[in-house]
């Protein structure tokens, strides 16, 4: 089996495919950060916390940063000792939850602080993967930690210690042809033809906008949403767009969406949409859409917040950078669920 891609789809599927395939070859363009997910039963103490007051827990989630109740860290990664930093990072590694990935308050805004976490994960990869050359290939160096969506895995890095698993670096050995029987590469050390029974394309998604513009949505005066968003999506709150009366989106571009606990965001958006529909009914109005000014100010507000962070520095699907020709703009709202 060949797997092309080492983003979330590849990272989650590669360990399982390795259990079943006689030979697995992984073609990697860009290594990504991942931490072990530690799947298993939730411990009783945590369950008791959830069950003690579900209504308060859910209300806290609505006003939290990412839709999961937690106390935000108030300390810089650069203000503590190396021992304290390592202990905090180890706790993140052992917990394995996206909601608790940043134990310090400047991980997302300060490159030097972020580098401390990046170095910790690099060291973890080197300690797990037996072959030093393979380990270095698996260490992400082109983006800061969590500027692409971090992955959770079940033995991903350990998989590359298996004798029947091979990693191909596409920078050194790019794919030249997909053939009837497999994959041909042409690299620095010459050409190679590899035969496979199956090829898995774990090459990503047109995130945030692809599913929406994939539908032929037409607004006022025959304007298509695809054309309206040709230079990047523009919305008010990520829920409505100028020129498309009565078109509502849930977790659309310009909303917290993928930077949040999606269940909480979905509920918020459904509440706003139903409140809006009730208002239309109660005022005998037929249509609603945002003004140009409201939409422009919302887009600018979202961009201003993103530019305070390290998020726009990565060529990520948050930016639309994984799709050739797609405008590079920061797609989700980065200000947090509570602020939103």
Question: What is each residue range found by the language model?
Answer:
Residues 9:
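Hydrophobic/small residue at the entry helix of a nucleotide-binding pocket
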Residues 6, 20-340:
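N-terminal FAD-binding dinucleotide-binding subdomain shared by FAD-dependent oxidases/monooxygenases
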């Amino acid at each position: 089996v060949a797997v092309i891609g080492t983003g979330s789809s590849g990272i989650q599927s590669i360990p399982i495919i390795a259990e079943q395939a006689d030979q697995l070859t992984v073609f990697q363009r860009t290594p990504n950060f991942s931490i072990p997910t530690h799947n298993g039963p939730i411990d009783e103490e945590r369950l008791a916390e959830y069950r003690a007051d579900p209504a308060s827990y859910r209300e806290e989630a609505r006003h939290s940063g990412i839709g999961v109740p937690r106390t935000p860290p108030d300390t810089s990664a650069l203000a503590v000792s190396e021992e304290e930093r390592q202990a905090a990072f180890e706790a993140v590694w052992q917990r394995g939850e996206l909601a608790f990935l940043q134990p310090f308050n400047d991980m997302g805004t300060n490159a030097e602080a972020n580098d401390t976490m990046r170095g910790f994960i690099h060291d973890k990869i080197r300690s797990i993967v037996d072959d030093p050359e393979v380990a270095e290939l698996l260490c992400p160096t082109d983006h800061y930690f969590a500027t692409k969506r971090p992955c959770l895995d079940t033995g991903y890095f350990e998989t590359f210690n298996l004798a029947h698993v091979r990693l191909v670096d596409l920078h050194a050995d790019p794919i030249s042809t997909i053939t009837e029987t497999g994959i041909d590469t042409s690299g620095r050390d010459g050409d190679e033809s590899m035969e496979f029974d199956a090829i898995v394309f774990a090459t990503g998604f047109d995130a945030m906008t692809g599913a929406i513009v994939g539908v032929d949505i037409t607004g006022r005066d025959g304007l298509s949403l695809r054309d309206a968003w040709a230079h990047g999506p523009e919305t008010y709150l990520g829920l409505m767009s100028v020129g498309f009366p009565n078109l509502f989106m849930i977790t659309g571009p310009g909303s917290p969406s993928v930077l949040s606990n999606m269940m909480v965001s979905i509920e918020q958006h459904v509440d706003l949409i139903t409140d809006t529909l009730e208002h239309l009914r109660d005022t005998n109005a037929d249509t609603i859409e945002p003004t140009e000014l409201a939409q422009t100010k919302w887009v600018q507000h979202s961009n201003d917040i993103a530019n305070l962070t390290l998020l726009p520095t990565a060529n990520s699907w948050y930016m639309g950078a994984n799709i050739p020709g797609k405008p590079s703009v920061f797609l989700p709202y980065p200000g947090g669920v509570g602020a939103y």
